[in-house]
């Protein structure tokens, strides 16, 4: 790929919103048959030792699963705060639930997002990565 073509691609990607970038990530995962998650190394248990407990996820995918019609305004406000989206983009995201809010978030941040959305009246799922 030429340097000019690469720079044009970088410029085009830089103009995408967070929501558009998340959709692009999903499309690329589907097209290439991959998952954009960091690999997790799991050590084998020592010989004769019992298997270790299940490793708890440190990163989570946060998905808005439900936004009741009578609670949408409050949920949109929280989504804007979390994602930095504009009013229209946040409204579109909330109305299209179930929709991914954050592709990757540390556990504390994911739980905080879940608490805020649930306080506003929505429902969220956290999927460990």
Swiss-Prot record:
GO cellular component: cytoplasm; ribonucleoprotein complex; ribosome
InterPro entries: Ribosomal_bL12, Ribosomal_bL12_C, Ribosomal_bL12_C/ClpS-like, Ribosomal_bL12_oligo, Ribosomal_bL12_oligo_N_sf
Molecular function terms from GO: mRNA binding; structural constituent of ribosome
Superkingdom per UniProt: Bacteria
Pfam families tied to this protein: Ribosomal_L12, Ribosomal_L12_N
Keyword set includes Ligase: no
Keywords recorded for this protein, A-Z: Ribonucleoprotein, Ribosomal protein
GO biological process terms on file: translation
Protein family (similarity comment): Belongs to the bacterial ribosomal protein bL12 family.
Subunit structure: Homodimer. Part of the ribosomal stalk of the 50S ribosomal subunit. Forms a multimeric L10(L12)X complex, where L10 forms an elongated spine to which 2 to 4 L12 dimers bind in a sequential fashion. Binds GTP-bound translation factors.
Matches recorded under PANTHER family: 39S RIBOSOMAL PROTEIN L12, LARGE RIBOSOMAL SUBUNIT PROTEIN BL12M
Role of this protein: Forms part of the ribosomal stalk which helps the ribosome interact with GTP-bound translation factors. Is thus essential for accurate translation.
HAMAP family, per the entry: Ribosomal_bL12
The name this protein goes by in its record: Large ribosomal subunit protein bL12
Organism field: Protochlamydia amoebophila (strain UWE25)
């Amino acid at each position: 790929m030429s340097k000019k073509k690469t720079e044009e691609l970088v410029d085009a990607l830089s103009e995408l919103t967070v929501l558009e970038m998340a959709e692009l990530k999903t499309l690329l995962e589907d097209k290439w048959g991959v998952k954009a998650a960091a690999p997790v190394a799991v050590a084998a248990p020592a010989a004769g030792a019992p298997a270790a407990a299940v490793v708890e996820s440190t990163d989570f995918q946060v998905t808005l699963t439900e936004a009741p019609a009578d609670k949408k305004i409050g949920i949109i406000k929280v989504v804007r705060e979390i994602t930095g989206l504009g009013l229209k983009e946040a409204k579109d995201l909330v109305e299209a639930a179930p929709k991914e809010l954050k592709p990757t978030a540390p556990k504390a941040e994911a739980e905080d997002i879940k608490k805020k959305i649930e306080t506003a009246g929505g429902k969220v799922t956290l999927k460990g990565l």
